[in-house]
UniProtKB/Swiss-Prot annotation:
InterPro entries: FN3_dom, FN3_sf, Ig-like_dom, Ig-like_dom_sf, Ig-like_fold, Ig_I-set, Ig_sub, Ig_sub2. The keyword Cell membrane applies. This protein is a cell adhesion molecule involved in neuron-neuron adhesion, neurite fasciculation, outgrowth of neurites, etc. GO terms for cellular component: axon; plasma membrane. Glycans are attached at residues 222, 314, 346, 432, 458, 487. Coiled coil: none annotated. This is Neural cell adhesion molecule 1. Heparin binds at residues 152-156, 161-165. Keywords: Cell adhesion, Cell membrane, Disulfide bond, Glycoprotein, Immunoglobulin domain, Membrane, Phosphoprotein, Repeat, Signal, Transmembrane, Transmembrane helix. It comes from the Eukaryota. The lineage of its organism: Eukaryota, Metazoa, Chordata, Craniata, Vertebrata. Residues 766-807, 815-829 have a biased composition (Basic and acidic residues). Polysialylated by ST8SIA2 and ST8SIA4. Polysialylation modulates cell interactions by confering both attractive and repulsive properties that are highly regulated by ST8SIA2 and ST8SIA4. Polysialylation is formed on a-2,3-linked sialic acid of core glycans.
């Protein structure tokens, strides 16, 4: 009975199971970590009111509408299990259980396998390393199964490079020992799982940073302060990435200030310091920095400074005071040396009696002592004299420059009087007695005569004029009583001083003495000695008197005393040849004409050839030209007709003889050879013949090798000046061409003007004779220089009937210089011959004044 009951129940359940068939689609599932997947539970059968439930691997019933593992009841016959973002813990057997209304259950299971795909967990890119370090390239790979890691660079397995620096570590990281900049690039970390045939890779960019290197272009930079100049400090920095450069001054960061004291270049590698002064002297450090590190370089800026006097002080002392000290302080770098000078002496450069360097220097007379220490110098004056007063200049000097400052020493002293004690004059002649006064403070000056203060009613012919440095007593003697002693007294708060002056009555001078008479044909030079007594006043003039033997009338002439006294000679002119004369002299001063000397007889020479002229040379500024002055001497009683000049370089042939008019007083020799010795011979010629040759020797300068450059920054010609020069040159060239056409072809603008305006004959007319006074001396077909001499009408009066010019004391032998007329030589292939200029003398002839004694 019991067995039958159990059989019935078994059949009942089997019938129910058949009626509820449960299936899960898909029947199995593999999910990669992080992926999502769903499973559908389907129920087949006629049962109603079924309940479909899902259970997790740990047996817990999954509730609907969960976020990550979701269960959704679709209808009476299906339900969906969805696993979002699966992880390893979600793996296991999930069960779908269907419960009928009668309580019967049916179920199905699905085995969910969750595996880890080959993924790169930690493989950042780029990865940066410092050059030279051991670099480890990180590549963390995660996978359910252990992967095989391969590293590639430039498409090749790094292991195959056979570079011992490349090592794959046990954690599959790639190590590069002592990584280099050339190792930079893309490295591929490739993972493989053989069981699944799975492969994945990650490209990692490897960057090798190079630590910066920095080098100062100059480790020491010199500059000068207070000149408004700028100085640039330069650092050359390299590295990767490009390093940033910053600057410090004595450890403090330098910023780009608003006043633009500091200026930086775009990459800050250059630091410009504007308006350098002494405060800018410091140690500057340029710091280059990037990811790989930093490096610095030092630059020492040395700022030199021109000396500057920072302290001087004026001093006051009393005469005969023991000593006084003047002090001078100066700044500058290098430390300046200080020297002292006055307006009359350079104290520091004088020979020293003792010299303890650098502290003490003493002058030979021991009056001044200079002490110097560092930037301070003092000048001590001993036994003060009034002459020590005045300006003292201290000068500070170093290699950069110098500075000077003046200070003043005041010396207070009693008056000191000076002046000519004896003063000469004569009755009616006004004279000043000068009393020079030296005093500090200023002195009051008084004049006395016989104890009586001047001026007074008793001395109406006396006036007094005072200046800061002297007092003048103006006396106009009326009688002998006005001559005698006068007293000058000066008083200040230090003391007083008096000086006696004597007013002496002047006399006329004594007679000059004639030493010798040098007669010529028409002139005579009288040598004399000045009078032994001048009478107390200067001699103003000399009077010469002469007459021919047998004549009663004396001829006379006045000569300026200064000119006559220079050589002690007066020249009398207008004499007749072969005639005996007597001559005598007298001197004139302010008092009057003195005694006349005894007469001295002489006889003039017969008419003869002239005396040789005196020659004096003056080199031209160009160095290869010379002006030879012709100083006319005695003409021998017959007018000089002309001068003959010849010259040559020593050891060379003579240049063609040059004929100069008698009025010429110099000749210009140009285009001479450089650094050559020349000799010049000049002969004067009159109707009687030629004089002896005057000889003159000179040497030209060495040829300059270069024209000195002008150092002035503003010496260059402006564009306008250059254009002006070119225009003037062009105009001169046109004029030269026109002049050439005029003289050679009788055509051109000048010829047109001459024909139409001046009435000159046309090109076909016969040329007129040359004007008087113009001559050209040349030889046909000669290559010798052509000398053209132009002068005004020569005055050549008949020697027998007219008077002629002789040198005298008022007309010097050298006659007035006139504008030169050049005589240019022809051009040859050899060096240009000398160019000769002559200057005529058109001075008015001196007319001899005759006066009777």
């Amino acid at each position: 009975m019991l067995q039958t009951k159990n059989l019935i129940w078994t059949l009942f359940f089997l019938g129910t199971a058949v009626s509820l068939q449960v299936d899960i689609v898909p029947s199995q599932g593999e999910i990669s970590v992080g992926e999502s997947k769903f499973f559908l539970c389907q129920v087949a059968g006629d049962a109603k009111d079924k309940d479909i439930s899902w259970f997790s691997p740990n047996g817990e019933k999954l509730t609907p509408n969960q976020q990550r593992i979701s269960v959704v009841w679709n209808d009476d016959s299906s339900s969906t299990l969805t696993i979002y973002n699966a992880n390893i813990d979600d793996a296991g057997i999930y069960k779908c259980v269907v419960t009928a209304e009668d309580g019967t259950e049916s179920e199905a299971t699905v085995n969910v396998k969750i595996f880890q795909k080959l993924m790169f967990k930690n493989a950042p890119t780029p990865q940066e390393f410092r050059e030279g370090e051991d670099a480890v390239i990180v590549c963390d790979v995660v996978s359910s199964l252990p992967p095989t890691i391969i590293w590639k660079h430039k498409g090749r397995d790094v292991i195959l490079k056979k570079d011992v620096r490349f090592i794959v570590l046990t954690n599959n990281y790639l190590q590069i020992r002592g990584i280099k900049k050339t190792d930079e690039g893309t490295y591929r970390c490739e993972g493989r799982i053989l069981a699944r045939g799975e492969i994945n890779f990650k490209d990692i960019q490897v960057i090798v940073n190079v630590p910066p290197t920095v080098q100062a272009r100059q480790s020491i930079v010199n500059a000068t302060a207070n000149l408004g100049q700028s100085v640039t400090l330069v650092c050359n920095a390299e590295g990767f990435p490009e390093p940033t450069v910053s600057w410090t001054k004595d450890g403090e960061q330098i910023e780009n200030e608003e006043d633009e004291k500091y200026l930086f270049s775009d990459d800050s590698s250059e630091l410009t310091i504007r308006k350098v002064d002494k405060n800018d002297e410091a140690e500057y450090v340029c710091i280059a920095e990037n990811k790989a590190g930093e490096q610095d370089a030092s630059i020492h800026l040395k700022v030199f400074a021109k000396p500057k006097i920072t302290y001087v002080e004026n001093q006051t002392a009393m005469e005969l005071e023991e000593q006084v000290t003047l002090t001078c302080e100066a700044s500058g770098d290098p430390i300046p040396s200080i020297t002292w000078r006055t307006s009359t002496r350079n104290i520091s450069s004088e020979e020293k009696a003792s010299w303890t360097r650098p502290e003490k220097q003493e002058t030979l007379d021991g009056h001044m002592v200079v002490r110097s220490h560092a930037r301070v110098s003092s000048l001590t004056l001993k036994s003060i004299q009034y002459t020590d007063a005045g300006e003292y200049v201290c000068t500070a000097s170093n290699t950069i420059g110098q500075d000077s400052q003046s200070m003043y020493l005041e010396v207070q002293y009693a008056p000191k009087l000076q002046g000519p004690v004896a003063v000469y004059t004569w009755e009616g002649n006004q004279v000043n007695i000068t009393c020079e006064v030296f005093a500090y403070p200023s002195a009051t000056i008084s004049w006395f005569r016989d104890g009586q203060l001047l001026p007074s009613s008793n001395y109406s012919n006396i006036k007094i004029y005072n200046t800061p440095s002297a007092s003048y007593l103006e006396v106009t003697p009326d009688s002998e009583n006005d001559f005698g002693n006068y007293n000058c007294t000066a008083v200040n708060r230090i003391g007083q001083e008096s000086l006696e002056f004597v007013l002496v009555q002047a006399d006329t001078p004594s007679s000059p003495s004639i030493d010798q008479v040098e007669p010529y044909s028409s002139t005579a030079q009288v040598q004399f000695d000045e009078p032994e007594a001048t009478g107390g006043v200067p001699i103003l003039k000399y009077k010469a008197e002469w007459r021919a033997m047998g004549e009663e009338v004396w001829h006379s002439k006045w000569y300026d005393a200064k000119e006559a006294s220079m050589e002690g000679i007066v020249t009398i002119v207008g004499l007749k040849p072969e005639t005996t004369y007597a001559v005598r002299l007298a001197a004139l001063n302010g008092k009057g004409l003195g005694e006349i000397s005894a007469a001295s007889e002489f006889k003039t020479q017969p008419v003869r050839e002239p005396s040789a002229p005196k020659l004096e040379g003056q080199m031209g500024e160009d160095g290869n030209s010379i002006k030879v002055k012709l100083i006319k001497q005695d003409d021998g009683g017959s007018p000089i007709r002309h001068y003959l000049v010849k010259y040559r370089a020593l050891s060379s042939e003579w240049k063609p003889e040059i004929r100069l008019p008698s009025g010429s007083d110099h000749v210009m020799l140009k285009s001479l050879d450089w650094n050559a010795e020349y000799e010049v011979y000049v002969v004067a010629e009159n109707q009687q013949g030629k004089s002896k040759a005057a000889h003159f020797v000179f040497r030209t300068s060495a040829q300059p090798t270069a024209i000195p450059a002008n150092g002035s920054p503003t010496s260059g010609l402006s564009t306008g000046a250059i254009v002006g020069i070119l225009v003037v040159t062009f105009v001169l060239l046109l004029v030269a061409v026109d002049v050439t056409c005029y003289f050679l072809n009788k055509c051109g603008l000048l010829m047109c003007i001459a024909v139409n305006l001046c009435g000159k004959a046309g090109p076909g007319a016969k040329g007129k004779d040359m004007e008087e006074g113009k001559a050209a001396f040349s030889k046909d077909e000669s290559k010798e220089p052509i000398v053209e001499v132009r002068t005004e009408e020569e005055r050549t009066p008949n020697h027998d009937g007219g008077k002629h010019t002789e040198p005298n004391e008022t007309t010097p032998l050298t006659e007035p210089e006139k504008g030169p007329v050049e005589a240019k030589p022809e051009t040859e292939t050899k060096p240009a011959p000398a160019e000769v200029q002559t200057v005529p003398n058109d001075a008015t002839q001196i007319k001899v004044n005759e006066s009777k004694a």
